[in-house]
């Protein structure tokens, strides 16, 4: 089975902290490139490259807006994140089990400490 192009993989797209921050910003609503770029210490073309990766991974959608239709407005399309979430959920049981063991260990230690103080 052929692998998708790396730039079209939602896992790789969300691996970058700048792209995750862009997705977080777009959760608040659609935004043009200029508005998104204002949130980052990088050039507008650099932000556009990040947006292209997100668009190729189908995590954002681009549409034309503004009075003359030249402005590019970006919208979050979180559907592909379901694959990422499903994969991450596999590890939830691992963490829950580990936390439950830690809780039991702490509770045993607390109980022993109380018993020793009561003697």
Show where each model-derived region lies:
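Alpha-helical hinge/cap motifs
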Residues: 15-16, 43
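C-terminal regulatory/oligomerization modules of transcriptional regulators
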Residues: 1-6, 25, 30-35, 39-44, ...
């Amino acid at each position: 089975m052929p692998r998708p192009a790396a730039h079209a993989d939602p896992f790789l797209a969300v691996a970058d902290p700048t792209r995750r921050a862009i997705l977080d910003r777009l959760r608040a609503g659609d935004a043009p490139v200029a508005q998104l770029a204002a949130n980052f210490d990088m050039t507008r073309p650099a932000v556009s490259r990040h947006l292209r990766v997100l668009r190729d991974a189908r995590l954002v959608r681009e549409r034309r807006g503004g009075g003359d239709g030249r402005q590019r407005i970006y919208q979050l399309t979180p559907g592909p994140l379901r694959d990422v979430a499903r994969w991450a959920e596999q590890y939830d049981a691992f963490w829950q089990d580990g936390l439950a063991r830690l809780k039991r260990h702490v509770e045993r230690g607390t109980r022993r400490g109380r018993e020793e103080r009561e003697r």
